[in-house]
Every structure is written in C-alpha cells, then in structure tokens.
Amino acid sequence: MRARQQLLASLQAIVKDMGLSWPEKATLEPPRDKSFGDLAANIALVISKDAGVPPRELASRLAGALRDSDPAIASVDIAGPGFLNVTYSPDFWRETVLHVEAAGDRYGATAVGAGRKAQVEYVSANPTGPLHIGHGRGAALGDCLARVLRFAGYDVTTEYYINDAGRQMRLLGLSVWLRALELSGRPFTLPEDFYRGDYIKDIAAEMLAKDPGLVDLPEAEGQDRCFEYAMNSIMDGIKQDLADFRVEHQVWFSELSLVREGAVEKTFERLKAAGLAFEQDGALWFRTTTLGDDKDRVLRKSDGTLTYFASDIAYHDNKYDRGFDLVVDIWGADHHGYVPRMRAAVAALGKRPEQFDVILVQLVNLLQNGEQIAMSTRAGQFETLHDVVREVGADAARFMFLSRKSDSHLDFDLELVKQRSMDNPVYYVQYAHARVCAVLRKAAERAIVLPARLDAAALAPLTLPEELDLLRLVDRMPDTLSAAAEGLAPHHVSFYLMEVAGALHSYYAKVPVLNAADAETIVARLALLRAVGQAVANGLNLLGVEAPEAM
C-alpha cells in the first residue's frame, strides 16, 4: 500500500527527530470503520512512556508534524486514548492509476526478498501412483508461492524430491511383479498391503508386451526391473500431469542419489562429530531431544536399513550446501508430527529457525452431486489430478485449491466450478477482468481514445466514493503481495482478488462508464477500469490462472 509506506516513512522520520526508535509494536492498519480514515496508527500510545508525554498530547504533536510533512494528507484526527486516524486526499488516491500504468505487469512487485535465494519443495509424492487432488492442492500452493516470492524479489528454485528409495518403492516393484505373474498365468500370492490400482496391472501388461520373458527372470531381478520401469512410468505421468496443471519444477532430486553418493553417511558423521548421534541396541539414533523434539529418533535401524528421516536430513543438508537462504517444504497435514524433528535436524545443521519453514496442506474433500468421493492410492480408489483438470480445467482447479488457507479443509465442488455464474469464485474473478476488457473494446468501437499515459488532471473526474474505494483497493496490492511473500501465505492473493472483483462488479452495476455526462469523465473512468484490470491480471498470473479478455 503506497499510502501505508508513505505514512510509515513520515512517522518514522518524525519519531527519529524526537530521538526515539521505531518500536516493533507500532501498527499502521486500515480502520474497521472507513469513516475513521484511511489508516490508523497507534504510535503515540506505544512511545508515550519513552517520550515522557501523555498519549493524546503526543498524538497531537505527531498530527501537527504529519500535516506539515506530507501535503498528500487531507486530515489527521485523534481518537480514543491517542490513536491517529489519517485520511489521504482524493488527488493522492487518483495518482494510483498513474503508478499502475507506469508499472504495468510488474505492478504489485516489491523488493522484500532483496535477491535472497529461496527453495520451495512441493508435491514430492511417492512415485507409486498417479497424483490425486490432495497433491494438486500442494502443487497449486507451491507453484503460486514460488511466483509470489519471485514477484517479491527472491531468487527462487522449485524442486520435487523423488522418494525412490525405501520400503514403498520395493512394494511397488513387488506389486507390478505379482501382476505380471498373474497376467502370465503363473502362481502368485497377493499380500494385503500391495498396490491394487488398475494402473499397476497396466504397467505389468506394458512390460510383458515389451518383454514376455520378464516372468522367467529370478524373482529378485524381476522385481528390480519392475520397480525401475514402474517408477519411471509413473514419474513420466506425474511430470505430464503437473505440466498440464501449469506447475513447473526446475529440479527433480532423487532420494536414491543421496544413498548412492554417500551423502547420508556423510551427514551421520557430521552429527556424530557434533555429539548429536549415538549408537544404541545396534541402531544409530539422533539426539533430537536436545533440540526441542519430544524424543530421540532412529536414523539407521538395527538391521541396517535407513529411516526416511535419515535421508531427509541428508537432503536438507544438501539444500543448504547449495546456498539457499530460505528453505520451504510443503507437506500434507498428516505429516504435522514430523515438523519438530525436521526443525531439530535443521538446527543441528547449524541453520537459524528463520531459514526453514514448513507449510502444511489440509485435506481436500472432492464433491460430486453432493457426494464425497473416496480416495486411497493403495486401494486404487481415488480421483486423480489428471481427471479433475480434464473435467474442470486448470484455471478452475488452481483457483479453487488457492481459495482457502492451506491449513483449512477444502470442499472442492466439481459442479460449482463448472458453472458460469457469480456463485463460482473462479468465474467471479475472471469475469472482472473480462468485463474491463469488454468496456475498453466498446470504447474503442465508439472511437473513444484512452491515452496510453495520462496526467493527474485527467483523473480529476474520479470523485465518487465507489471510485475512491476502488483506488484504495488497487493501492493495497503491493502490501498484500508483500504479506503473502513474508508470511508464505499465497491465499492472500485469491482473497484480495475476490475483494477487488466484488468492488469492480458493484461499481459497474451502479456507475455508467461509457454513458457519463462528459467525455472527460468517460476517459477518467476508463483509466480507472484499465488500472483495476491490470491489478486483477497481475494477481491471476501469480495464481497461475489466465486472465481472459472475453467470457
């Protein structure tokens, strides 16, 4: 928010001139009641004691200094025990249009990242089956977060961690092998925990078509081949599904590579040297209790097999070796118990808490005709991301996945997101952009010329409360995106777009744009709509959703 940044700079300068430091508890926020002004500041209350002046008296001094320092301020009122309610002039808000025009598709971008290197790891589903809609929510979240961080000045790398080691992968190979035996008429026994989906049979049939002698191989060799083929086949499908969903990973990192290259053992030695790993009962343990975890954790079992935790520590060691200042992991909510031990591991690697964060993604309930669709990868009962994208489109799926906070459960109504109505949030926001484009096209058809660049005088006709409210909303975009980046909370973008779309639709219904009383007002209103459309387009781009020009 340009207004917030401008007011913050003015108040900080005034406080500094008083010989005081700017306190962390100072806030500048829009008041709940718009009649109180554009921004409310509690600074007089917070520094009153240090200044040795009663809050209201101090507020009066600050108000006078503000009026003198910033001609864009229309009024400063003192409320309650000493709050400052600041109102900016209409001219100030009208200048928002000029700022949007100057920035174009970079409007809303900030420099809060200051070029720091960030890595966002997301999806990272075991390559044991197709992606389901829960993975889709994590994919949309991770991709949007990466876009938001880049827009905020971070140097971002996106990454998928391929869990190609461990028991689940051995079970995948066994499952395909047994299906190959079944299809060949050979005797076989299916364990209870094998993967049952039709895709397992399809992979087995594909392998047999290429190599009918597969089932004549020794069992261990046959299972190894089944594992390699199945994993590659499933990963190819995952990559294609993500590409169709407009999700890009720059790095695909293999867990197996950590084991083969000795990275896990290297990490063990590092922990031992720090006194954080110890042998007990034939197993290797990580002393995580000294780092805030509720109990110590096994790294290598007594039979010599590695735990997932062991590979994960080595993987994060590798991340920091690559120079990332910020590492963000996006996990399913069922991994919440894993967070403390991972934080302990990062601390053991010598990293500060602010260099690592985990975003937990809650479950998605897929609804069709009011009925919830059950999902289970191992049982082969699930609605795949591929099926959902094919049915409703990437735009609708991405927006819906990003329409709630990641830690909130999400009901994904397949019928709702296909509706061309204002009840459909995807349609609601996209139609706001399409509506702006339609008005601009009609203006062109009537030979109404909107200059590529306007001056402040041309915007003077924007005097209606609805117009100033729209300008305030557009001005808020940079602050909103900064909050989304700093809080690792991309839902701020979709929430903001819903608010802007609502204000735009309301304005369009109430105010004649092309039928205004004079040409000057028409041009000013068209410029306002163009600025709103640019803000909506920029926000949709951050969500990875198209901004259609017609619907």
Swiss-Prot record:
Any one GO molecular function term: ATP binding
Enzyme class: ligase
Record key words, sorted: Aminoacyl-tRNA synthetase, ATP-binding, Cytoplasm, Ligase, Nucleotide-binding, Protein biosynthesis
Catalytic activity field: tRNA(Arg) + L-arginine + ATP = L-arginyl-tRNA(Arg) + AMP + diphosphate
SMART domains: Arg_tRNA_synt_N, DALR_1
SUPFAM superfamilies, per the entry: Anticodon-binding domain of a subclass of class I aminoacyl-tRNA synthetases (SSF47323), Arginyl-tRNA synthetase (ArgRS), N-terminal 'additional' domain (SSF55190), Nucleotidylyl transferase (SSF52374)
GO biological process annotation, one example: arginyl-tRNA aminoacylation
InterPro entries given in the database record: aa-tRNA-synth_I_CS, Arg-tRNA-ligase, Arg-tRNA-synth_N, Arg-tRNA-synth_N_sf, ArgRS_core, DALR_anticod-bd, Rossmann-like_a/b/a_fold, tRNAsynth_Ia_anticodon-bd
HAMAP family associated with the record: Arg_tRNA_synth
Identification of the protein by name: Arginine--tRNA ligase
Organism ancestry: Bacteria, Pseudomonadati, Thermodesulfobacteriota, Desulfovibrionia, Desulfovibrionales
